[in-house]
C-alpha cells in the first residue's frame, strides 16, 4: 500500500554488503525519499528493494478485520495489524507475543495502532473473556473507552494510580499461579478448559496497556520498572499481557531489562537510527515514511516485517465503545 518491493536475484559472486551500500545511490537515482534494502528476504535467495509509492493507499480497519483468516481464528487476543508489502492482510495474536512494545515519533501512527489493538479485541471478546487496564497519561488517547464493561477500573490518567495498578497486576499474577498449582494445570487455557470448572471461576485474559511509558518512567522510575519486568517475565502463563507505547524510545525509558523481556516490538517512523536501534536492535525505522508505515519484529523471526498499519477512525472507535456501553451487564 505504501511501498513497492522489487525482488532482485544478484549474481552469486556479488556480496550482499555491496548491495546494501547502494541504498542512498538508488534513492537519489529514483528521486525517492528513502529506500530500504532487505538482503536477503528471509527464507528466499533474493534481495528485496522497497521503494515508496508516489500515492499511498490507506488500509481500512474493516478490510483486514473481515479477512477469512482473522474471522476463522479462535483467539480472543487476535488483532488486525495491517497489510504487508505484497498487500496481504496481517493479523497477530497478543497471546502468543506475549507482550508488545510500540514506539514511534509524533504523527507516525503509534496512537492509531494502539486503538486498533483495543478495538480489534473489543470486537472479538466479551467482558467475561478479556478485561483491560488502560493507562493513559496523555489523557486523550484512551479516554473514548471510558465506562466500557471490559475495564477493570476507570481509564487511569495519573502516574501514582498507574503504579498501584501495576502492583495489583503483580498480586493478581501470583494469585492466578496459586489457582493453576491447585488445579494442576500449566496455563490459563488449560485451566479454563477444565471439565469440572465452575463458569464463575473462569479466568479472563487481562491486557494492561500503557500509553506513554516515557511519562511514567520519568515520574516513577524504578518503582514501575520492577513490576513491569516481573509481569513481562512471568505473566504469560496466567493470561496477563502488556502493551507498552512510547514516543521517546531512549535507553532510560526502554531499559535493557524491559527490552530483554518484551521480545515483540513495533517501530513506526523514528527521528534517528539511534532510536531505531533502541527499539529493534538494528537501524531501519528512521527510513520509514510515517502515517502507519511500521517495522514489526515478532519474537520468532530474525528480521522485522514491513507493514502498513490499519487506520481506525474516531467514529469506528466510538461506535464500538458505545455498543459495549449500551449492553446489559452479564449476571
Summary of predicted features, one role per range:
Residues 1-7:
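N-terminal anchoring/assembly modules that precede and organize ATP-driven motor systems
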Residues 110:
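Conserved lysine of the Walker
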Residues 38, 103:
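Residues at the beta-strand->loop junction immediately N-terminal to the Walker
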Residues 113, 117:
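Hydrophobic positions on the alpha1 helix immediately C-terminal to the Walker A/P-loop
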Residues 100:
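Conserved beta-strand position immediately N-terminal to the Walker
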Residues 1, 13, 23, 44-79, ...:
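P-loop NTPase motor-domain active sites and their immediate coupling elements
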Residues 41, 106-107, 246:
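The conserved Walker
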Residues 7-16, 21:
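A short interface-forming secondary-structure element
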Amino acid at each position: 500500500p505504501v511501498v513497492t518491493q522489487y525482488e532482485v536475484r544478484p549474481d552469486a559472486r556479488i556480496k550482499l554488503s555491496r548491495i546494501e551500500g547502494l541504498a542512498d545511490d538508488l534513492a537519489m537515482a529514483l528521486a525517492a525519499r528513502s529506500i530500504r534494502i532487505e538482503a536477503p528476504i528471509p527464507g528466499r535467495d533474493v534481495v528485496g528493494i522497497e521503494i515508496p509509492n508516489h500515492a499511498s493507499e490507506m488500509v481500512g480497519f474493516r478490510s483486514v478485520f473481515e479477512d477469512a483468516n482473522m474471522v476463522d481464528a479462535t483467539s480472543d487476543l487476535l488483532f488486525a495489524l495491517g497489510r504487508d508489502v505484497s498487500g496481504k492482510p496481517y493479523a497477530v495474536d497478543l497471546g502468543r507475543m506475549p507482550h508488545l512494545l510500540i514506539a514511534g515519533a509524533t504523527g507516525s501512527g503509534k496512537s492509531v495502532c494502539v486503538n486498533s489493538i483495543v478495538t480489534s479485541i473489543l470486537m472479538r471478546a466479551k467482558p467475561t473473556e478479556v478485561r483491560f487496564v488502560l493507562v493513559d497519561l496523555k489523557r486523550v488517547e484512551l479516554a473514548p473507552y471510558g465506562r466500557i464493561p471490559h475495564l477493570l477500573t476507570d481509564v487511569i490518567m495519573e502516574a501514582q494510580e498507574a503504579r498501584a495498578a501495576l502492583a495489583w497486576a503483580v498480586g493478581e499474577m501470583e494469585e492466578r499461579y496459586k489457582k493453576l498449582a491447585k488445579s494442576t494445570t500449566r496455563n490459563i487455557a488449560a485451566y479454563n478448559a477444565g471439565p469440572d470448572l465452575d463458569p464463575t471461576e473462569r479466568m479472563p485474559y487481562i491486557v494492561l496497556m500503557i500509553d506513554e511509558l516515557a511519562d511514567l518512567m520519568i515520574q516513577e522510575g524504578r518503582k514501575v520498572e520492577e513490576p513491569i519486568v516481573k509481569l513481562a517475565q512471568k505473566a504469560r502463563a496466567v493470561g496477563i499481557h502488556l502493551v507498552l507505547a512510547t514516543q521517546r524510545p531512549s535507553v532510560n525509558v526502554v531499559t535493557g531489562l524491559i527490552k530483554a523481556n518484551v521480545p515483540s516490538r513495533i517501530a513506526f517512523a523514528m527521528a534517528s537510527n539511534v532510536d531505531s536501534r533502541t527499539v529493534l536492535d538494528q537501524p531501519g525505522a528512521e527510513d520509514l515514511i510515517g502515517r502507519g508505515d511500521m517495522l514489526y519484529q515478532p519474537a520468532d523471526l530474525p528480521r522485522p516485517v514491513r507493514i502498513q498499519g490499519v487506520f481506525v477512525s474516531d467514529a469506528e472507535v466510538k461506535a464500538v465503545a458505545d455498543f459495549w456501553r449500551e449492553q446489559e451487564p452479564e449476571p
